[in-house]
Amino acid sequence: MNYIGLSAYDTANGPGVRVSLFVSGCTLRCKGCFNKESWSFTAGRPFTAETEAQIMKALDSKWIAGFSLLGGDPFEPEHEAVLAGLLERIKERFPDKTVWAWTGRTFKHVEKSRLLPYIDQLVDGAYVQKLHLEKQGAWRGSSNQRIIPLYQGRIDESPAAQAEAAAAEAEH
């Protein structure tokens, strides 16, 4: 698996200061995508043990709120084994940090993914240019995309989780 970006201090992709990984490869190719350079599976550089060590070191700070996984599309089948292992190790070492992930697919299309048990918030849905959100910090590109709270790989239907997701969508 390749990646096109790693940010140790990201404030645009989820709440608080986060570590963000942008993976390479996306077969969806949404019109108006902000990250077209990520479409190729060979873009960027290979994800290695050294890359993972950089992520873990960056996460090992009290002021880092969590980890964000973007792309490309992290839910491409080619990424599943590497990313499931990475997310499992992140959650084992940093159980109090949140994991956010973005996909152009709907929850229904990724509900069996091995990544979901390690994700706290999933932003799902293809980017639709005519529904573009102008507001900075929207955590999603278009209004059709949803912020879905997850618990153990399933949609968290608890009132608290749903209220938090609704507030995130309304606020951002």
Provide a role label for each language-model segment:
Residues M1-L6, V17, N35-V99, F107-K112:
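Conserved Radical SAM active-site core
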Residues S7, V123-A126, Y151:
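Residues at the C-termini of beta-strands that transition into short coil/loop
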Residues P77-L83, E88-K91, H132-H172:
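P-loop/Walker A phosphate-binding loop and immediately adjacent motor/lid segment at beta-alpha junctions
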Residues D120:
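Receiver (REC) domain switch/active-site residues of two-component response regulators
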Residues T11, F75, F107, K130, ...:
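Surface-exposed, flexible loop/turn segments at secondary-structure boundaries
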Residues G71, T103-R105, G125-Y127:
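Short secondary-structure boundary segments
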Residues N2-R29:
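N-terminal pre-triad scaffold of radical SAM enzymes
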